[in-house]
Amino acid sequence: MTLTRIGPRIAFVACVAALPVVALGCPQAGDQGRAEFDAFFEKVSEAEAELFRGRPEALQALWTREPEVTLFGVSGGSGAHGWDQVGPRLDWTRTQYSDGSLTITRIAAYVSGNLGYVVQLENVRFKVPGHAVESFLQIRATWIFRRERDGWRIIHRHADSLIKRQGPAELNAVEQP
């Protein structure tokens, strides 16, 4: 076996180059990975706009079917866990939204390796099917994504109404169940 002596400068460069892998435990996404993620999220945004028109199919197709999938929707409730709950929850939206439009303000987005997230504000105008009155929702949304064998997939969404900021002193006491 032959040993090769390396200088301190080369050792330093090698250590710096390895830092993201060691510190984060996974390779960085790089420009190509980020471009793929951004293209996928563009599909998510288009599909979400369709959901508010009463057509959830395009968005449903972008979700993982793995058991750990979760959805905490803007309509409240205890949330959905597993595709057997998430799928029907998305189906239910067709009875809640029609003639909708969506405007998005992205707050943050990040991708590293096989995981990514997006945090955004969503302004939605829609009608409840069968009603003429237009409604308006302001939503805070967090999406989490994972790259799977067949590409990027949604693994979690948490959305809630954008409400007025309140401190504990301003809240009414709520009875515990």
State where each predicted segment sits.
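N-terminal secretory signal peptides that target proteins for export/translocation
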Residues: 1-6
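Bacterial N-terminal signal peptides
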Residues: 11-22
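Short, low-complexity N-terminal intrinsically disordered segments enriched in polar/charged residues
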Residues: 20-65, 114, 170-177
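A solvent-exposed, acidic/Ser-Thr-rich amphipathic alpha-helical stretch
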Residues: 35-39, 56-113, 121, 135-136
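Glycine-rich beta-strand-turn "strand-cap" elements at beta-sheet edges
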Residues: 107-111, 159-162, 171-176
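Short beta-strand edge/turn micro-motifs at domain boundaries
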Residues: 117, 138-168
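Extracellular loop and loop/strand-boundary signature of outer-membrane beta-barrel proteins
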Residues: 129-131
